[in-house]
């Protein structure tokens, strides 16, 4: 078995056969400020709406976002929602959709009305028929799955109890997969775990697990004991119980239970977090990870998913940044180009309660004075962002002969330092716009300045932050080094 970083290169070579209930997720965002005069009901002033591939389709999207290939088998109706889903899946380069159309039922569609300000779900409207698929449609699904099975490295059944995963279909797929020595992961909905007998791994949430095992599932000891009984019933290798803010517990048939606490994040939306967990587990196990590595990766994936709005997918880069400590990331992963997206980093760090620090400069030729400022800056915060003047900006500030090194080279040198968590290139002459975007808790500046002279001090102070001044080291400056080099005295 392989550790997390060793698994990553193999992910792109894996194919996951995902089968389950496909649905169209729509999120309508707005604000409620009044009650309808027609009835005692809130009126939502709609600001925007989003449409996403949901249910088992979101599992497929997560698999593809992680870089693996996904063959997806699902069911749609002969309607606009079905056509929207079919087109959306077909547009994903790593997803091969194999969709069966059932004209007798609508495509499952869920519309959620959400407070744009508080990210609170106010109402959900569903269009669905949850009855099992007809015998004819069931056979079409089974035939499609068995035809695709040889091409898969692992099978994932995503059960939302909307009619795709009938008892017969589950049985035929698991039996066929076992004959081909392919592992099967099941995200179950039925409380009868015997239905999934022979699967490799079941991934119920705590509510589903408690219902299936008729236990309270309110302690790790009880979860472990009940899981071992359930493993015998389901004849599976392991059961993973997800527990929202309390983390996850994996109970293998052989060996001790493993519990990992949830990452401390600001929860924006829990929709689809279970999909991410199932997808990460499938991809990691297919790529050669052991239970422990797959569990910790899935836990990290869930943390990223719930920090996003709507039905979210998680990329391999996001997963890697969550699993690995910042200091271990490659330099190029710590660089944001001018105008690039800072939000994922800021959201993640703030959700974890981390103090974000900021300093800036040209950093043309790194010298001990720079190192002193960067070290002091990192010591004053939990995560340090360095604003780096672009080549055009340096030229305007320092003259036509500068910079000596281009912005990419300067950024890579800074990003290689353990003290630096993120390098952000900016085009302006001052970092004011960047500071306005970041609103750091700590603003650090080296040199002979007063607090009032530091660009952006008022923005930081207004949010209760602090400005830290660091004395410069005498005799160290890039301008002096460049002049000495030009005069042959370097």
Swiss-Prot record:
Residues 358-490 are annotated as: Cytidylyltransferase. GO terms for molecular function: ATP binding; heptose 7-phosphate kinase activity; heptose-1-phosphate adenylyltransferase activity; phosphotransferase activity, alcohol group as acceptor. GO terms for biological process: ADP-L-glycero-beta-D-manno-heptose biosynthetic process. Residues 1-330 are annotated as: Ribokinase. One of its GO terms (cellular component) is cytosol. Catalyzes the ADP transfer from ATP to D-glycero-beta-D-manno-heptose 1-phosphate, yielding ADP-D-glycero-beta-D-manno-heptose. Keywords: ATP-binding, Carbohydrate metabolism, Kinase, Multifunctional enzyme, Nucleotide-binding, Nucleotidyltransferase, Transferase. The keyword Kinase applies. The active site is at 275. The keyword ATP-binding applies. In the N-terminal section; belongs to the carbohydrate kinase PfkB family. Pfam families: CTP_transf_like, PfkB. It comes from Rhodopseudomonas palustris (strain BisB18). Pathway: Nucleotide-sugar biosynthesis; ADP-L-glycero-beta-D-manno-heptose biosynthesis; ADP-L-glycero-beta-D-manno-heptose from D-glycero-beta-D-manno-heptose 7-phosphate: step 1/4; Nucleotide-sugar biosynthesis; ADP-L-glycero-beta-D-manno-heptose biosynthesis; ADP-L-glycero-beta-D-manno-heptose from D-glycero-beta-D-manno-heptose 7-phosphate: step 3/4. Its EC number is 2.7.1.167, 2.7.7.70. It catalyses: D-glycero-beta-D-manno-heptose 7-phosphate + ATP = D-glycero-beta-D-manno-heptose 1,7-bisphosphate + ADP + H(+); D-glycero-beta-D-manno-heptose 1-phosphate + ATP + H(+) = ADP-D-glycero-beta-D-manno-heptose + diphosphate. SUPFAM superfamilies: Nucleotidylyl transferase, Ribokinase-like. Homodimer. ATP binds at residues 205-208. This is Bifunctional protein HldE.
